[in-house]
Amino acid sequence: MTKRVILGHPFGNANVRQALAAFTEGGILESFVTTLSAEHFRMLSLLPASFRKEVQRRSFPGVSSDRIKSSAGQELMRLVGTRLGRSVPKIRSVTPSVDEVWKSLDLRLASYAAQASGADLSVYAYEDGAFHTFSSPHTFRRIYELPIGYWREMHRLLEEERDLQPEWSSTLKGLADGPEKLERKERELQMADAILVPSDFVLSTLPQEFARKGTVVPYGCPEVSVGAPRSFSPGNKPLKVLFCGSLGQRKGLSYLFESVARLGSQVELTVVGTPVELCRPLEVGLSKVKWISSLPHAELLALMRQHDVFVFPTLFEGRALVVLEALSQGLPVITTPNSGTTDVVLHGRTGYVIPIRSVDGIEMALEELAKDRELLRHMSDEALKLASETSWLSYRVKLLNAMQNFEFIKQINQ
């Protein structure tokens, strides 16, 4: 039985924070191995205001500071280099990459795991940050979270997309990983004792040798803000449509732009996100809509409440957190099965589930909501209701249960 957990992640995304909260609440968190932690940053007041906010976002309230094992140097260099590289391109060549940060984190996690090893220890690692840790000869359970679908399946789908939409091919960065990185991904899955995934979609992409070690623990929705102002467009005004995410073709952007163009004055599209890489069709598409490159999280949630519907026609995900956020703000969602959210985006109730690459599907769903504002309001109410039932608390409970059922999973797979 797991009595101690060491968790390793360089950035502390929303799902990571919830896993930390679960292990803390369960009294089993041994340590959290990370890069930058505001709790350990001594020069915060000396930083420029914008950079200070970036560091403050790397705060982990609720986790005792002595359990946080941070090493900020490389990640600080990456953040500074990324900012300066916009105006001084030469700096990019000496700026650590995200992949290098992951590798360093993995090596540090392996060291902490070796020091604390024992039959009651589980090490909780993530894709791209587990290879060295899981290769260790020391005794501990190797728990692996795969937050997005299996890489071979993603490559298959994105290679298809490259052929279908060649003008968007430069934005398909998922095809850029080299053979060494892909081999590490494969070995991580092979060495894992148990694999946790956030959706049935992710599990469905895994080959049987990995899927039999898999357990679905769905990420939850943010807390629903009771009484938060929510506006709807009048029936004689265009439907306000929102997209938020990285701006590349993996998110199905070309299909969204085409469907909105077909609908003309019936809809108004707002796009929030940073381009993966600019290409001509993306520039043209953004020129025809309202584009916001980035927003603080609280402002994004407020923006959601000012729109009527959220569209996320992604080709490949794990479990799209932005969809869960949209539901929590009362937005019906139009998305694909590959978003990993079909348990909460219920077709005809809280939104529409359409096939990938379906311009017709997006168009028909938007047109129905534009013409039937009562249906829109009903779906909004249902979205809030379902979001409140699919909380992060339920995720934390399920995660702790999965950790304690590890021995059962192992016996099945032997």
Q: What positions do the PLM features span?
A:
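A short, well-ordered alpha-helix in the C-terminal region of glycosyltransferases
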Residues: 361, 368, 375-389, 401
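Short alpha-helical donor nucleotide-sugar binding micro-motif in glycosyltransferases
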Residues: 189, 294, 302-307
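Conserved acidic donor-binding segment of nucleotide-sugar-dependent glycosyltransferases
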Residues: 347-348, 352-359, 368-373
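Conserved donor-binding/catalytic core segment of Leloir-type glycosyltransferases
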Residues: 221, 229-251, 257-262, 270
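Short hydrophobic beta-strand element within catalytic cores of glycosyltransferases
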Residues: 332-335
